[in-house]
Amino acid sequence: MENWQATEILPKIEAPLNIFNDIKTYTAEQLFDNLRIYFGDDPSRYNISFEALLGIYCNKIEWINFFTTPIAVAANVIRFNDVSRMTLGKVLFFIQLPRVATGNDVTAPKETTIMVAKHSEKHPINISFDLSAACLEHLENTFKNTVIDQILNINALHTVLRSLKNSADSLERGLIHAFMQTLLRKSPPQFIVLTMNENKVHNKQALSRVQRSNMFQSLKNRLLTSLFFLNRNNNSSYIYRILNDMMESVTESILNDTNNYTSKENIPLDGVLLGPIGSIQKLTNILSQYISTQVVSAPISYGHFIMGKENAVTAIAYRAIMADFTQFTVNAGTEQQDTNNKSEIFDKSRAYADLKLNTLKLGDKLVAFDHLHKVYKNTDVNDPLEQSLQLTFFFPLGIYIPTETGFSTMETRVKLNDTMENNLPTSVFFHNKDQVVQRIDFADILPSVCHPIVHDSTIVERLMKNEPLPTGHRFSQLCQLKITRENPTRILQTLYNLYESRQEVPKNTNVLKNELNVEDFYKPDNPTLPTERHPFFDLTYIQKNRATEVLCTPRIMIGNMPLPLAPISFHEARTNQMLEHAKTNSHNYDFTLKIVTESLTSGSYPELAYVIEILVHGNKHAFMILKQVISQCISYWFNMKHILLFCNSFEMIMLISNHMGDELIPGAAFAHYRNLVSLIRLVKRTISISNINEQLCGEPLVNFANALFDGRLFCPFVHTMPRNDTNAKITADDTPLTQNTVRVRNYEISDVQRMNLIDSSVVFTDNDRPSNENTILSKIFYFCVLPALSNNKACGAGVNVKELVLDLFYTEPFICPDDCFQENPISSDVLMSLIREAMGPGYTVANTSSIAKQLFKSLIYINENTKILEVEVSLDPAQRHGNSVHFQSLQHILYNGLCLISPITTLRRYYQPIPFHRFFSDPGICGTMNADIQVFLNTFPHYQRNDGGFPLPPPLALEFYNWQRTPFSVYSAFCPNSLLSIMTLAAMHSKLSPVAIAIQSKSKIHPGFAATLVRTDNFDVECLLYSSRAATSIILDDPTVTAEAKDIVTTYNFTQHLSFVDMGLGFSSTTATANLKRIKSDMGSKIQNLFSAFPIHAFTNTDINTWIRHHVGIEKPNPSEGEALNIITFGGINKNPPSILLHGQQAICEVILTPVTTNINFFKLPHNPRGRESCMMGTDPHNEEAARKALYDHTQTDSDTFAATTNPWASLPGSLGDILYNTAHREQLCYNPKTYSPNAQFFTESDILKTNKMMYKVINEYCMKSNSCLNSDSEIQYSCSEGTDSFVSRPCQFLQNALPLHCSSNQALLESRSKTGNTQISETHYCNYAIGETIPLQLIIESSI
């Protein structure tokens, strides 16, 4: 046994011609022989350390394998024995600049030498293995002659060799991995290198704002165009050009040794291109014509540092990779141990060996081309070139494109049915990663939109109060509103004080907003823009107690949204959706609408009709007494003047249609009255989009959907006290009315007490109250039909009943005995002229006297003088949430008043115009009947308008407390006199509450706002690395091996000390994200559930809370206090995940509420989803005050458009979007910390400033490194700036941009575009849109399936 050779024990290994394998085999044999020496029976041979043998063996195998890999092309290996003691090395290189000889008396350039300093980077690698005590015992025992002893010794040797082989392999991989990591740390992405090469600046030159912004934009464009370039197409020229750009963008190495890695044709390799196996295989297939296998000359030795006294490099020598083990054992422990000769198996003059490498011809240069798959195969370390990437996408839902601006850019004709789903889209379609069509509509986003936080203005109001008040001109525009409250009796007394003062009335913010068009609203010179922070609340400034305060009130209804955010045509489109949903029949009401419109706006109207209205005041018995008179008036005016009388009074219309079907009036006239009632009922049925029979909180569900059904909204004209089922506070004087203070009218009996109080403030009512049905119909008439057909050319009026009755009827023969009463004619000229005007001039005196006496008979049902009633009532339970719990809406209604459609002249002294509502405040009627108002209008002619611009008396001008606000009056003032306009006004009464939004969304009716959906997807990508030749020096020494003996095992630790030195003149390496390996998330349609993100919040009303949770799919009740505390502290996740996941990890789509008028072009390019850019390269982000102004100061134009924002509900500080997704507000919201928010990166101020500072630093540092060390600072170290890795892996966060997603508002458009592969171009098809993607992910996914 003592004479055995290594080849007799180890398995036979056939040594190929390749010399590297020869070295490996010979090294293994020598190691085994030396192990026998160490563990033999001769004690004199114990002079060799076992640890030293292991270190030498691993060192030799490690470096032989390194030199056989293509990555070694980028390395220059140098030995330095004291590298373990070196913490920071600084190597100086002297470089002589090339010169160009000149002539023509030009001074020749002088010889110039530059000293370049390069810093070393220490990076030790470690590995360890264990040998059991039993194994070591068998090794230490002397070899015996028995077969069992031989087998045990051989097995022990094999165990040692297996451990050594595994450790040596680990060091091989570790060396390559460490070198790869070093290359990556000094390899900026190609898009950065190309940008800096194009924008080179002097290293001492400070970047201007324009330069920095240009560089940033160039970085963004190059990043988006270079991502996944291997997947975009198979065009070899395109890919070849990108690879050539990678090679040309880097610099050469300081060391230009052309002996290493040279082909047989003496063509040196200029660099190496590395990538994961998938990318390399793709390149091999695409660029096969440029790829070949070359035999190159590879080094088998490494350099050796010789250090002088000055600690500077004075020479470089060469040393063999492997020393002879026999000579090492002889010299171990002596002075000659470091003077070993080269291995005996080599020719002493040979320092290179031939190696086959794949090469790629790029232009006139040759580069190595391979992957390192075998290095990382079956290990727990990922290939550094296989990286992760996060991209954030955004896309719109419910954006409105007006029909008047509609056009089609679709080349292929797409046919869509003429349905409102196609004319006002409420869905968005896109593909997930498996090419399955996904759809999101408003019903899907209810878990976000119907959360209690979204409908609570507490934080919005508080943050606005904490902000500085407007100053200068903006203060005078926004902060002049005063809220004036007076008791209703005093209102009538001071009604005209405003007009008598003849002073300009400041406009409130609502008026200012609605005077702007869509484009102007979003501009920075819009002073009201900072007050538009929430879609469901009006915010403004008011003067109170000589101080400026913030006022926040619910908008209550969709129609109260400013018209620039919800334009007229949009409301009409919503109405058409309701008509389609209700399947409203197309009964022709055009002729009726035409005659009613002409009657309301003709300007000629008999004053007797107003007297009759006062006498009847909705009383059936009074109507029956005057039935003959009324029929004669109607017949005359309809036949002679084609005017339909009493079309301004709902009560008269109902009485006529119910009691005059006996041919007392022309059939055509009666048909118009019946059509009017039918039309009103049609409107009611159309807007009843919910189940009327369903109850919620004890009320019909339809009350929560539309305000016209809500008993809290009162009819503006009433003659008897309406039902007060909602406990509204109704005030006629100083105190609210109660059941005890409201007196009952006693008709047909002596009612002297009421007659005495007819002109007092006491309120009388009838025993019979109007039914709920008639109340709803009357509100539809006065709030929809009358404004739409009269265009607000109507006015409220009060009548002094006492004086009118006394003057007209307290004369003979009315006060004479019955005999005289029947015989004597009427002597009142005024009354006779009124009757002739109403009946025509053909009536005799006897006939007119008879009519007058009939009028007199109806006085037993006379009502009282007109009063103004103030109605103060809270909102419905769904809107009574947060700050709105204490909100009380205000209405002023006319009690015993009437609606004038023409001025009264003859009886002017008895009638008083009362502009109490914007629908009923025609300045023409008011000015004609009141001299003070006329003078006021002459002084300020711009108030001669019907769109709400005519100022109401201050106690009646409570814009922010009223139900109908400026947008209603603006629409009704200019709308066409059509059924659609009536329906639109009714649809505008749809409520802005979570219940109403849920009802509308599930009925496929647009809820009045759009949404920006934001989703972050995760990708595994493959990168390419190009490094120039000898770009990095590796400084090494022999590994250090230590043994740690324990009871049953001995642990051997290998440590290889390495230092790396960059040898490039500039950036000598670069990377590019080339290939999409896999999509980790599903790219699907799962909506963020805010009930999980903010689990503690609940609606104030328990029934509402339960209903909402049920209808949006949140079945779990509110957590208990203990559960809530645990969620806030430790986070909580859904316990019931979907039972089946078909498409992988679900990506979350978050919802940002957005105005429907947001420009669709905003979604066609990368933008910040908050609506305003957040990357501030024009501002120094270290100046945080200036940075915050760039973020939030909307008096400054946005960096990307001429507008200040595209979504003030998200971009303004303290806006709804800011509160939901800015993590600074989470402490106030009880946030679930385990909820992921893709929007947080765009809203959190601290993160935005941090990434901007990082981006600012990245651009500045790369600009300093844009020149090589020959023409810039020689101390510059060309490594990646801090933040580069984060920039590459999360570009959307650093760019503060989300990317457009390929989507469309109609599935037909999506399918049409996918069929043609046209996914990167955005198109419009009338009211529909298709958004093109910036990165062609759709095509990439399709090509990979």
UniProtKB/Swiss-Prot annotation:
GO terms for cellular component: host cell nucleus; T=16 icosahedral viral capsid. This is Major capsid protein. The keyword Cell cycle does not apply. Homomultimer. Makes the hexons and eleven out of twelve pentons. Interacts with triplex proteins 1/TRX1 and 2/TRX2; adjacent capsomers are linked together in groups of three by triplexes, heterotrimeric complexes composed of one molecule of TRX1 and two molecules of TRX2. Interacts with scaffold protein; this interaction allows efficient MCP transport to the host nucleus. Interacts with capsid vertex component 2/CVC2. Interacts with the small capsomere-interacting protein/SCP. Keywords: Capsid protein, Host nucleus, T=16 icosahedral capsid protein, Virion. InterPro entries: Herpes_MCP, Herpes_MCP_upper_sf. Its main location: virion. Belongs to the herpesviridae major capsid protein family. GO terms for molecular function: structural molecule activity. The keyword ATP-binding does not apply. Self-assembles to form an icosahedral capsid with a T=16 symmetry, about 200 nm in diameter, and consisting of 150 hexons and 12 pentons (total of 162 capsomers). Hexons form the edges and faces of the capsid and are each composed of six MCP molecules. In contrast, one penton is found at each of the 12 vertices. Eleven of the pentons are MCP pentamers, while the last vertex is occupied by the portal complex. It is found in: Virion; Host nucleus.
